[in-house]
């Protein structure tokens, strides 16, 4: 199949257009060339975008696909009237019908993150990220009671990226704590976690995959050996079962899938949007 270029155009950061567009494109098993055009917030910039879109179509021999989140109708009109691509505008598709249904006018605010630094949701995210970094890999037991979620599991099972995703995406204070051989010998959770069992969620992983990941970090070590990985995973899963901790395998799941499952199970009281 010949190349097809996809443009993500916004008068803000373009994050919404790109997220929406990529979710749609993921349904099609083909490769696209991605071009981001954020801050397209004037007629002049819109005409420049049109030139890029039309040029890409000529080079590719195919219409470009254009995902937009443009609030300024004059800017959007330049795109829709002059470009030779297939234009998919989120606001025309969703916001305008909602205005009719709700009998309300939308704010038509440019950019999802306009004045974001002043919003409570933004501040919650910053606080959550700082908290999660301070409580990564059991670094600190201080204020552990303020965690919304505490992830537990063996080293390299996906705890850190999941904690940071929960903090950045939802403003949740997500701590994470490793389960190590000393815990397995005692056959008990780390003492610092016992008072917070309702907030615990376990992550596990197939030993073979864990060994691959660890060998990238510390090749040919006991830590990365398949035998050791099998032992740690088995002991960690047994401990989680004994302690009544909910858990899932991260082996074939994305960070987004892991986080969504955790939220369904834990159901924290607050989320920052």
From Swiss-Prot:
Keywords for this protein: Kinase, Nucleotide-binding, Serine/threonine-protein kinase, Transferase
HAMAP family linked to this entry: PSRP
Biological role: Bifunctional serine/threonine kinase and phosphorylase involved in the regulation of the phosphoenolpyruvate synthase (PEPS) by catalyzing its phosphorylation/dephosphorylation.
Organism of origin: Albidiferax ferrireducens (strain ATCC BAA-621 / DSM 15236 / T118)
InterPro entries according to UniProt: Kinase-pyrophosphorylase, PSRP
Any single Pfam family the record assigns to this protein: Kinase-PPPase
Entry protein name: Putative phosphoenolpyruvate synthase regulatory protein
GO molecular function term, any single one: ATP binding
Leading EC class: transferase
């Amino acid at each position: 199949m010949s190349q097809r270029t996809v443009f993500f155009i916004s008068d803000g950061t373009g994050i919404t257009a790109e997220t929406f567009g990529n979710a749609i494109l993921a349904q099609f098993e083909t490769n696209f060339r991605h071009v981001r055009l954020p801050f397209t917030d004037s007629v002049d910039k819109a005409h420049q975008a049109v030139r890029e879109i039309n040029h890409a179509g000529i080079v590719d021999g195919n219409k470009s696909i254009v995902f937009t989140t443009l609030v300024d109708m004059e800017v959007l009109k330049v795109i829709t009237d002059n470009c030779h691509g297939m234009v998919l505008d989120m606001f025309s598709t969703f916001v305008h019908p909602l205005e009719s249904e709700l009998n309300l006018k939308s704010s038509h605010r440019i950019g999802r993150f306009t004045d974001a630094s002043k919003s409570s949701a933004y501040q919650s995210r910053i606080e959550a990220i700082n908290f999660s970094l301070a409580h990564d890999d059991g670094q600190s037991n201080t204020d552990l009671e303020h965690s919304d979620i505490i992830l537990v599991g063996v080293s390299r099972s996906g705890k850190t990226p999941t904690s940071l995703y929960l903090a950045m995406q939802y403003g949740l204070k997500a701590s994470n704590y490793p389960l190590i051989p000393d815990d397995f010998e005692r056959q008990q959770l780390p003492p610092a976690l016992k008072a917070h069992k309702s907030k615990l969620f376990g992550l596990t992983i197939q030993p073979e995959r864990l060994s691959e990941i660890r060998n990238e970090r510390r090749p040919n070590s006991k830590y990365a050996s398949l035998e050791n990985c099998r032992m740690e995973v088995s002991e960690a899963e047994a401990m989680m079962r004994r302690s009544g901790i909910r858990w899932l395998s991260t082996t074939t799941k994305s960070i987004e899938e892991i986080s969504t499952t955790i939220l369904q199970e834990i159901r924290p009281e607050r989320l920052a949007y």
